[in-house]
């Protein structure tokens, strides 16, 4: 299994939203899959405990990754 860093998640300056930032280069290189209706997607993974820590102010940022075979 391989993991590729795709970007990061952080709280907005106002604190009412999460900001998601993806590397355009990583996104271009990311593995894609087709849904049953033929739409193309890029699957991403974020650790939910780390997102909670960002939301609660315990962490400033957490990573977004893609896991592939």
Question: Model-flagged regions — what are they?
Answer:
Residues 1-69:
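Single-stranded nucleic acid-binding surfaces, predominantly the OB-fold ssDNA-binding core
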């Amino acid at each position: 299994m391989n993991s590729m860093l795709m970007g990061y998640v952080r709280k907005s300056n106002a604190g009412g939203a999460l900001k998601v930032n993806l590397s355009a280069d990583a996104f271009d290189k990311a593995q894609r899959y087709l849904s049953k209706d033929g739409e193309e997607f890029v699957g991403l993974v974020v650790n939910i405990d780390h997102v909670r820590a960002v939301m609660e102010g315990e962490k400033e940022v957490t990573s977004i990754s893609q896991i592939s075979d």
